[in-house]
Amino acid sequence: MSLQIRNDPFTQRLQQIGQWIAQGLLQPAAQALTEAQAQHPKDVRVALMGVRLAQQAGNLAGAVQAARRAVALEPGWFVAVTELALQLAAQGQFSEAMEHARHAVALAPKEPRVLHSAANVAQGAGDGKQALTWAQTALQLDPQNHPLRLDYAGMLYRERQYKQAQDEFNRVLQAQPGNEAALRNLLTCALQLGDQSEAQRLADVLIIRNPDDEQVRYWHAVAHGQTPKTQPEASVTGLFDDYAQRFDLHLVSGLKYRAPERVAQILLALRPDRRFNVLDLGCGTGLLGVYLGRLHGHLIGVDLSEKMIEQAARHGIYSRFHHVNILDALRDTPADHYEVITCLDALIYVGDLAPVIPNAFRILKAGGHFIFTCEAASEDEADLVLRPDSNRYAHKASAVERQCREAGFDEVQFEHLESLRNEGGKALPGFIVIARKPLAVPADAPAAA
């Protein structure tokens, strides 16, 4: 939120501090801000400038603390209250963030900036209905605010109101014909609405504009009825960076996701002495580590989302993390290195298993286990299916077993699940695969790609 604007010398000093923060000159900014605090200890603008400084330094807890000081100084000022709501949301403290968001809206019910910020807090908290209400009110007050309309359209899309979202994205595009975000979102709306010809038209426009963009190439292939082998890194990273703060609560409580708990049980039954090393591919927020507990070995996490890794690190169970994609981790890890490799709820984004299974076999020590989950494609579907509603891959069990055995695994067991997770209120079938590398690997075992 913006600060109150004055023209006195102290305000000019604060503006100078703000410029230093924007330029990354944090040490002189911090020193000057400390002096400003000593001179004007009750000026709320100093506290709000402290929020900016802490944000730039990557100190999220410090940003919350500074925002709390601002509210303590001016409890009835909507700018300070809104800032605290935003900073709490950034820390994943959504319950308190929503309290302050509601308070801010009550203080300034006709201020579009407040309503827009409150809507973003609600969206992060998983309260899509409230987010839409606040965003719609903000848009009624400020109908020419195109970034706000773009956010509102995105909220409609996330609530699966695809036609309404399409209408709003079109309004943005009419006002700003070059708006790339609106154009890309119109493409995904067309796909969700089953309008293949419109999706193809939009995809063709985008590919001409952005021939080297991997996300555009991906969606161009989907729009033209092809199944890309894998999803673009940027798509997966963006999804989970946005999702990280509420991932555990949403996945476990909302979607009834139990795979990490079940896989931990399987592992401890196979190796009750806990003497094994695990490579956890797509570790997310570290749910497998939570259910496994301490090992007499190393638990190494791999994830493409740095924010997910930050959440996983809080458990204090993982030995270390690698911020890379799964395929790179598999390719670059030395052979005969781990007793266990896990990959839970991640292959739905990886897609093609050809570079996955043989490399997992190579990395495992003799007698090691590769345990992974897949969403289930039926046996009358293709080996690899891209679900248009969720944009996730499903795998056919018989094809997965064939690939495991071709790679050299001698035991391949399946645990079929009627509900891998809930999706749109319905159980989504899937399976857990437990593949064992032989105790003695044949000399003619196939090489990894």
Feature names for model-found ranges:
Residues 10, 44-45, 78-79, 112-113, ...:
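Helix-start (N-cap) detector for alpha-helical repeat units in TPR-like alpha-solenoids
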Residues 22-23, 56, 90-91, 124-125, ...:
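Register position in tetratricopeptide repeats
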Residues 49, 83, 117, 151, ...:
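Canonical tetratricopeptide repeat
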Residues 279, 285-330:
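Class I SAM-dependent methyltransferase SAM/SAH-binding core
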Residues 331-341:
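A short acidic, Gly/Pro-enriched loop at the edge of an enzyme's catalytic core
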Residues 354-366:
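A short glycine-rich, Lys/Arg-flanked "PGG" loop and its adjoining helix->strand segment in the class I
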Residues 372-392:
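Short, glycine-/aromatic-enriched active-site segment of Class I SAM-dependent methyltransferases
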